[in-house]
């Protein structure tokens, strides 16, 4: 008998660049900095994409959208996440829930949590109660504490399409 539920973990980090806004969780946060990257730098979408793909055994974001491909330069990370969700569905899986921890000194996540949850829930095809975004600081330690960038850890559960419970 095959498993009806799987779990995946995703991680991403980006250094900060000058100029805003900062794109996180599919929304723009007013800021004088942004997450530098080959795409739009949305570390939340990147970590969630990897968590989902990993749970389903479908590779990772770097395989789907290599940074060596010029077509991915500046790409909207929500589009990447939507593609991962489509791949998940094609393989017989659906999103169960997603739990996200953003490790950063700035920006503060709390004021933007509801908008991120709503945006991500729409993209993932789940209720907003199935998406949670937490913000944590690094207590001033290391590169995150020095406000050089941020890190994101995401955990996702996926369920076999057609299953409602375990």
UniProtKB/Swiss-Prot annotation:
Any one biological process term the GO annotation gives: isopentenyl diphosphate biosynthetic process, methylerythritol 4-phosphate pathway
GO molecular function: 2-C-methyl-D-erythritol 2,4-cyclodiphosphate synthase activity; metal ion binding
CDD domains from the UniProt entry: MECDP_synthase (cd00554)
Cofactor note (record): Binds 1 divalent metal cation per subunit.
Superkingdom as given in the UniProt entry: Bacteria
Cofactor dependence: a divalent metal cation
Reactions it catalyzes: 4-CDP-2-C-methyl-D-erythritol 2-phosphate = 2-C-methyl-D-erythritol 2,4-cyclic diphosphate + CMP
EC number, as in UniProt: 4.6.1.12
Pathway it works in: Isoprenoid biosynthesis; isopentenyl diphosphate biosynthesis via DXP pathway; isopentenyl diphosphate from 1-deoxy-D-xylulose 5-phosphate: step 4/6
Keyword line: Isoprene biosynthesis, Lyase, Metal-binding
Metal-binding among keywords: yes
Matches recorded under SUPFAM superfamilies: IpsF-like
Keyword check for Metal-binding: yes
NCBIfam families, A to Z: ispF
Quaternary structure annotation from Swiss-Prot or TrEMBL: Homotrimer.
Free-text function comment from the UniProt entry: Involved in the biosynthesis of isopentenyl diphosphate (IPP) and dimethylallyl diphosphate (DMAPP), two major building blocks of isoprenoid compounds. Catalyzes the conversion of 4-diphosphocytidyl-2-C-methyl-D-erythritol 2-phosphate (CDP-ME2P) to 2-C-methyl-D-erythritol 2,4-cyclodiphosphate (ME-CPP) with a corresponding release of cytidine 5-monophosphate (CMP).
Similarity remark: Belongs to the IspF family.
Protein name, UniProt field: 2-C-methyl-D-erythritol 2,4-cyclodiphosphate synthase
Species of provenance: Gemmatimonas aurantiaca (strain DSM 14586 / JCM 11422 / NBRC 100505 / T-27)
């Amino acid at each position: 008998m095959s498993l009806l539920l799987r779990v995946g973990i995703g991680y991403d980090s980006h250094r900060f660049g000058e100029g805003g806004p900062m794109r996180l969780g599919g929304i723009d946060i007013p800021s004088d900095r942004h997450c530098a990257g080959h795409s739009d730098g949305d570390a939340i979408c990147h970590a969630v994409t990897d968590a989902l793909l990993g749970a389903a055994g479908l590779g990772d974001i770097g395989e789907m959208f290599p940074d060596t491909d010029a077509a991915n330069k500046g790409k909207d990370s929500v589009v990447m996440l939507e593609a991962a969700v489509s791949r998940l569905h094609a393989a017989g899986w659906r999103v169960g829930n997603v739990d996200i921890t953003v490790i950063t000194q700035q920006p503060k996540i709390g004021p933007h949590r509801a908008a991120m949850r709503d945006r991500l829930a729409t993209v993932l095809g789940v209720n907003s109660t199935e998406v949670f975004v937490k913000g944590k600081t690094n207590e001033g330690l290391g590169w995150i504490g020095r406000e050089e960038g941020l890190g994101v850890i995401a955990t996702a559960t996926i369920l076999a399409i057609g299953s409602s419970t375990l």
